[in-house]
């Protein structure tokens, strides 16, 4: 949109207008994104997260939706992590085995492992058993945390109501 200097675009599905998306709809949402649950509120597909983070889905269903929980960065030791990770959270973390294990044991719905760090077979098996999606990204934790909200579907931003339309004769 920026490159073409377009400020409004129609959102269509099968040649039918679904809504309208403006640059300000997107920027307002990102600038006011103090809500750590916005990714789940938007019902974001895991495949969108994988694409946005230029990552790989290691465990889980890419067509599934992230629908409950907050997004957080695990930047503490596991003892402290236990106090702030809740069931269904999406946890962005690094290569520390203990942090990955803690997030899964605290019933996170998804862990995003940064810097392309390897994920051990034990962590993969436990994640599979517990239904925890595992995504690997080459990005560092700061970049992953910055970009992850860009994976939200446009349907979350677009305006659907009170659209004035017309047809050509």
Language model: regions and residue ranges:
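The conserved cystathionine-beta-synthase
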Residues: 1-5, 11-12, 164-169
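Feature captures the catalytic cores and cofactor-binding loops of soluble hydro-lyases/lyases
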Residues: 73-158
């Amino acid at each position: 949109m920026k490159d073409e200097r377009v400020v409004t675009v129609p959102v269509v599905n099968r040649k039918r207008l679904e809504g309208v998306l403006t640059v300000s709809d997107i920027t307002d949402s990102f600038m006011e994104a103090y809500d750590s649950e916005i990714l789940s509120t938007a019902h974001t597909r895991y495949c969108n997260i994988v694409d946005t983070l230029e990552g790989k889905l290691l465990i889980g269903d890419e067509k599934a939706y992230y629908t409950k929980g907050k997004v957080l960065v695990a930047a503490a030791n596991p003892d402290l992590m236990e106090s702030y990770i809740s069931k269904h959270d999406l946890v962005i973390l690094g290569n520390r085995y203990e942090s990955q294990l803690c997030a899964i044991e605290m019933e996170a719905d998804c862990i995003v492992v940064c810097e392309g760090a390897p994920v051990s077979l034990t962590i993969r098996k436990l994640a599979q058993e517990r239904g925890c999606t595992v995504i690997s990204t080459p990005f560092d934790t700061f970049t992953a945390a910055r970009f992850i909200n860009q994976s939200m579907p446009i349907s979350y931003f677009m305006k659907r109501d009170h659209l004035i339309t017309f047809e050509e004769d």
